[in-house]
Design a protein with these regions (language model features):
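Surface-exposed, charge/polar-rich loops and edge strands
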Residues: 1-414
Length: 414
């Protein structure tokens, strides 16, 4: 894998907590307005610039993208973002519930994405790619990083451990979620060279989160190469910013489903149909969480049920067919509830496990939804197997937590 250090554009220590933000795609415009209110230094003015226009302004209006570029320049003019004078790697650690994961902030190579060395597990939507491409073009920068996993490597771990014993550049706990974010600078030339060499020996990296940002960064890089008659291949636009974590440190949490109706069935008829493919056991009113693969938790009519897929209902040798999202999509959502397309069907919604199973109960008890289905989370091993075999995960399969904060460091393309 080809990586390189870069001259990060980042906030001085005293501004980092005001500048940093959550990623662009986890909040809607109204939520961002509320979160950025009264904070002129918030990165949201660059990644969600529609908040600087009257409510109801189309976030895809050309003037909104233009505003992002103006704000990015203004942040630099005012000294809220300052470019490092030297190419460096950085370390970004996140601590959630007492567990810490350590990521290396690097520039990944556009060609590695184009040739499939940077492996995907999700399909991207062209409209979302185009939105991010406009954002990269207008700012001439990767404002937000993507989230990669790499094969565990003790030599990389040792270099990271050496720096994380030292004083961090940033260290704060985010008010909203209580997660701790810590950031160190690697500026020793020998360590920088060693990290580059260690990654060069790796056969692959995996996109954990940020498929649209990765696609956009790579496509803009390829576009700039075409437009440059003197293209050499080592220009800054040939690279895009990623935070790379060892796969063994990452946790995927459950990504659950809620459905509006039972497709014309009564509760009893629905449960009877489920028993064709699942061993169904009523658990009662207390929240029940699945504890292993092929076990599901169902909430219906004030009761929780355990569902265990019967042998023969899935194929252990099929990396996609063996996934619980596939089993539940085929045997429950499609076969019984008539939901064919998870991306477009308005009867279904998805709830990240970070909200807890109480959120599923709440949405059913309120009458908004009729039934909830909780899944056992996908493992990193399953994700890597799927990416390695060139397969694609079904939609809404993986939820990584904690999410990367944006605004700790930015990569300029020239």
């Amino acid at each position: 894998m080809k990586i390189k250090p870069f001259k990060g554009v980042r906030p001085p220590k005293e501004y980092v907590e005001q500048v940093q933000s959550r990623p662009y795609d986890v909040l809607n415009s109204a939520e961002v307005r509320a979160e950025a209110e009264g904070n002129e230094k918030s990165l949201y003015h660059i990644i969600k610039p529609e908040i600087d226009f009257p409510e109801g302004t189309d976030e895809h209006d050309p003037k909104v993208y233009e505003k992002a570029a103006q704000n990015f320049q203004m942040f630099q003019d005012k000294g809220w973002l300052v470019q490092d004078g030297k190419e460096r790697y950085y370390i970004y650690a996140q601590t959630m519930n007492g567990k810490t994961q350590y990521g290396l902030v690097v520039c990944a190579y556009v060609d590695d994405y184009m040739t499939g060395k940077i492996k995907k597990h999700e399909l991207t939507r062209r409209d979302k790619e185009e939105d991010r491409m406009k954002h990269v073009r207008v700012n001439n920068a990767n404002i937000e990083p993507v989230f990669f996993a790499y094969p565990d490597n003790k030599d990389v771990d040792a270099i990271v451990a050496k720096y994380t014993k030292g004083t961090p550049e940033y260290d704060y706990t985010a008010e909203l979620d209580g997660f701790r974010h810590t950031f160190w600078i690697i500026d020793d030339d020998a360590d920088i060279q060693r990290i580059t060499e260690l990654f060069a020996a790796m056969p692959a990296m995996y996109i954990a989160d940020g498929h649209h940002r990765s696609a956009a960064a790579a496509l803009v890089g390829a576009e700039k190469a075409k437009q440059n008659p003197n293209h050499r291949g080592d220009e800054e636009y040939n690279f895009f910013m990623a935070v790379c974590f060892p796969a063994n440190q990452l946790t995927i949490i459950d990504y659950n489903r809620v459905v509006k109706d039972l497709n014309g069935l009564s509760d009893e008829e629905f449960l009877k149909k489920l028993s064709d493919d699942f061993i169904v056991e009523k658990k009662g009113a207390e929240i029940f969480k699945p504890s292993r693969l092929h076990e599901f938790s169902l909430y219906l009519g004030g009761n929780w049920y355990s569902l265990v897929a019967k042998p023969g209902t899935y194929n252990d040798n099929d990396p996609i067919g063996v996934l619980d999202v596939t089993i539940s999509s085929n045997l429950i959502l499609d076969k019984i509830l008539g939901i064919k397309d998870l991306r477009s069907d308005k009867r279904i919604d998805f709830v990240g496990g970070i909200r807890g199973l109480g959120e599923l109960k709440k949405r059913v008890d309120s009458g908004e939804m009729k039934v909830a289905l909780a899944l056992y989370p996908v493992s990193m091993k399953q994700l890597i197997d799927i990416a390695d075999t060139g397969n694609i995960m079904p939609p809404k399969t993986t939820w990584f937590e904690p999410k990367l904060r944006s605004g700790l460091v930015i990569h300029k393309l020239s």
